[in-house]
Amino acid sequence: MTTLKTICFAVTTAALAGCAATPRHYDDESSRALNLARAGGIYDQDLRDSPDGTRSYRKSLLMGALNLASLATSLDAPLRHLTGTQTLLFNATDIMMTPDNPSARPSLMGWMPASLAASEDDAYDHYVAVVDEAITQASESMAITATKLTDVKTPEIDGHPLMLWSVTAERYGCTDDNCIIAYNIQQPNHWKTPSYVIGGEAASYNIAANHPEKYSRLVFRQSGHELTFPVDEFYSAVSAALSSWIVMYFSPNTVIQDGEPLPYPVLYEQGQKLMFKEPDHE
């Protein structure tokens, strides 16, 4: 399995390297969502446009890593009992366990203007500050309380820790720390920005979704059997507060809307939820 991952990543990396001299061009025959996803490194062909956007994924994602009931069960013990314990570490690791294919997992993708940072390390710090501020603004706009957990040890991805936030919102069933936000930012790389990325510059510090393990993500999880938190609204609010050059991709069954998981993929850009819908039908 490790060898297969390495081979697949090498093939994808080679494809990306071939495009390094010029940024990816916009494909008028694809939706904006698909153009942004492809630019962000989601190249596998399980993801594609469909006439109405609800049949844009080729495979069933009813697997353990993305099964919301399974994920919720793993978080049943409230965080107030887990802080600093191996169980919290297990829960954080569980959130990280997603499929190899980029289209099958939630991902953050970004093209931070190179003028905003002096180095890749500086760019990482800037990304973290942007995401933290977006979570804070989104929480305030929805009148919920989100607290960043700084006293817990979490797994690292690409040399950087997984960030955890505890959410309190009694009207949505978030009490006793049973709701969390988890995100991570991989080490940004120098890249070229596609012209259709809003607010971008020609050169950027990029976080992409193509690596089998070292990719960025932001997910909300609510434990228990009743998924009452408006995750779709929260993701939209976070996206609206993020810089315009960051987009959020979610695979089927990972976004909760009206208490039910959406069975199709979506991408959030500037607060808008984009579907993978053929341009002729948009």
Question: Which residue ranges define each predicted feature?
Answer:
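Generic hydrophobic secondary-structure signal
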Residues: 7-8, 16, 27, 74, ...
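Compositionally biased, low-complexity repeat tracts
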Residues: 11-14, 36-37, 60, 80
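Bacterial Sec signal peptide processing site at the extreme N-terminus
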Residues: 18-38
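Mature extracytoplasmic/lumenal regions of exported proteins
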Residues: 38-77, 87, 91-282
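Sec-dependent bacterial lipoprotein signal peptides
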Residues: 1-21
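Compositionally biased, intrinsically disordered low-complexity regions enriched for acidic
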Residues: 82-86
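Short non-domain terminal segments
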Residues: 5-7, 24, 39-41, 45
